């Protein structure tokens, strides 16, 4: 048995156990279960005849692609670089094109060389997630890390481009493409305070983006949210809509910021079965232990036989005047946003309005492992979720509304019928509460 077969057996058996309850739903593009004995035998036959890591990575990538809903994939172990050449590059039709650039004139242009090296050869400098087309290796989406300027050739045209931080580049693209480019948007709509948060990412939390509030310039989301909270308290405001539609999650550090709009402490303690915990521990631990040091720390913690993880989510008392919070959610909410939605339903922190989330909030996310061959190619196997993104793990809103198919920049515009419905719901509840008080 060669080393490629041995290592593939580790990956295959591990994924087969991990995804046991999902196997009947995981079909390849040819409607063949990639975990079937036929699929396994076919791959082993290929592996028995290969002689290079590149051939091995090609087969592994093909196997991951057969899990075509993104349940597992190969990825570079390297962290995101501090600085990049500010271009998003994509491979299509056997060529590389600029998809996004601060300089819009470069978009949709074909890149032929970088620093005088043909693009096909230049990508060989990268270790990471490769794909294959007719035997040719390529990277689907390419970002060029660099601390210094690069000369980019577009056919006969050459341009020297200076690097910038990836965070600044992302911000420039968002600002250009989105009229509501700030991560946080605050407004008073028909008498109801409206707070929109586009992303819960750690990067956005640490950003230095500028906000304008009543003529004053404010730097960063923490200061901005604090100014908004003080404004609402000073006006004794009791109702607030928090819109997280389209927010795909990020860091639960944002929960501490939402405490600014809380009138008391809210806590939810829960226990969640991990993917590993759902399986037979005898079989699963045999697979895990077989991986030895190849398996990373985040997975090793599950080896002790504990079938669940104890978790706690809380939002502190911010002494806010806000008594009634309304959380707008939709099917573009994942991860931490789903956690916040579940938390709101469980504790009453907010009344959820909209359509169901896409789940994956109260689960183990994500984890990964590597093997000797993947490690020497600076790659790892990433499993982005617990594979239980099913209806029972989605969050249903307390009040359902018809979901609009909106682009991110269309939220809170005249096209946003969901928000219009939410405003009417909040106004009706506010009027009902005022009437109840007047009758007391």
What are these regions (language model features)?
Residues 1-240, 244-248, 256-273, 324-326, ...:
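Flexible, low-complexity junctional segments that flank or bridge functional domains
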Residues 348-349, 377-381:
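A short pocket-lining beta-strand/turn micro-motif at the edge of beta-sheets
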